[in-house]
Each structure stands twice: as C-alpha cells, then as structure tokens.
Amino acid sequence: MSAAKPKTAKKARAAPAHPPTSQMVVAAITALKERGGSSNQAIKKYIAANYKVDINKQATFIKRALKAGVANGTLVQVKGKGASGSFKLGKVKAGKTEAQKARAAAKKAKLAAKKKEQKEKKAAKTKARKEKLAAKKAAKKAAKKVKKPAAKAKKPAKKAAKKPAAKKAAKKPAAKKPAKKAAKKPAAKKAAKPAKKAAKKPAAKKAAKK
C-alpha cells in the first residue's frame, strides 16, 4: 500500500491544474459578454474565480495572451494599447484571416504549378530545337560524305574520254596512205606516152615508098 501512494501523487502532479492561459482568456471574454469589450481586470477576476490559479503569478501570462491574441486575430482590442484596455473576440476576423491564408496558399500552389508547366514547356522546346539542329548537322555531314565519292568517280570518266581521242589520232595516218598510192598512178600514164611516139614511125616508112 505504501508503494501505491507515491504513484497517485505523481499522477496528480502531472495533471495540469488549469488550461492554457490563452484558453482561459477566451473563456473569460465569452462568459462576460460585454458589448464594449472586457477589460484586463475583469478577465483576471473571472479567471481567479473559475480556475485554481495564483492570479498574481498569472498576471504576466494573461498580458502575453492578450497581446498574442490581438496579433493572431483571435482577439480585438477595442480600447487602450498593449495589455490595457478592453478586448473582444475576433472569431469573424480570425476566420477571414484563415480564409485569406487558404486562398493565398491556393494561389501560391497555382502559381507554382504554372511555373512548373512553363519550365517544362520551355525545356521541351529547347530539346526539340536541339534535336532539330542535331538532325540538320547529321544530314549535312551525310550529304558531304556522299558528294566526295561522286567527285572521285568523275575523274576516271575524264581519262576514259581521252583514250578514244588518241585512237582517232592514230587512225588518221592510216587514211593518208591510200592518197599516196593514188598520186603514183599518173606516173604510169606518163610512161605510156612514148608508146604513141613509136606508133608514128610507120608513117615515115610510107614516105620512103613514094
């Protein structure tokens, strides 16, 4: 039994005696329902009456909770500055700020998605351009390789054309030989002329007979 008592004491120490200060402040303002807002003193009185709290020690935490509530939008300061003055709940404004945050987050997400799409489109365009340029370069290189063997093949054609010209030049002297033989034939006719002179001699014999 003596060992079980310390365990129950530890559980009592671990359990908080009151909720967080911000929750107590909101509860005080909602319970007071003052049109002009609840003052810091009224909030302290409500917390001291409804919660087991040392209000002197909790005063600094209450001031911090009020300032933080105004900054977050959960509270609205109607009068005064800082922790002094009167405060109301700012649920409507808080809801608006949350909605605005959600809208801003949605807009940011849309902008991010658009930027990603634009980047992807630009990347695709650059890739397509690079591929086209690479294809053009490859086609030009292939065309150059095809043109070089064609130029080499033309040179043997020129050599083949020159050889028939040499044969034609060789045939021309062969055609001149018959022309020389034809020129020799008139010489044979000249040798036949003395034969005619020899035929005239019998006429001289006829004169002697007379």
UniProtKB/Swiss-Prot annotation:
Pfam families cross-referenced by the UniProt entry: Linker_histone (PF00538)
What is the protein name given in its UniProt record?
Answer: Late histone H1
Residue ranges annotated for the H15 domain, each copy included: 17-91
Asked if the Swiss-Prot or TrEMBL record annotates the protein with the keyword Nucleus, the reply is yes
Q: Which SUPFAM superfamilies match?
A: Winged helix' DNA-binding domain (SSF46785)
Q: Does the keyword DNA-binding apply?
A: yes
What the entry lists under InterPro entries is as follows: H1/H5, Histone_H1/H5_H15, WH-like_DNA-bd_sf, WH_DNA-bd_sf
Q: Name one GO biological process term.
A: nucleosome assembly
The UniProt regions of compositional bias labelled Basic residues, in chain numbering, are 104-113, 124-210
Q: State the residue spans of region: Disordered.
A: 1-21, 86-210
Q: What does the UniProt entry say about where the protein is found?
A: Nucleus; Chromosome
Similarity comment: Belongs to the histone H1/H5 family.
GO MF, any single term: double-stranded DNA binding
State the function annotated in the UniProt record: Histones H1 are necessary for the condensation of nucleosome chains into higher-order structures.
- Ranges of biased composition (kind: Basic and acidic residues): 114-123
Q: Which GO terms describe its cellular component?
A: nucleosome; nucleus
Keywords in alphabetical order, please: Chromosome, DNA-binding, Nucleus
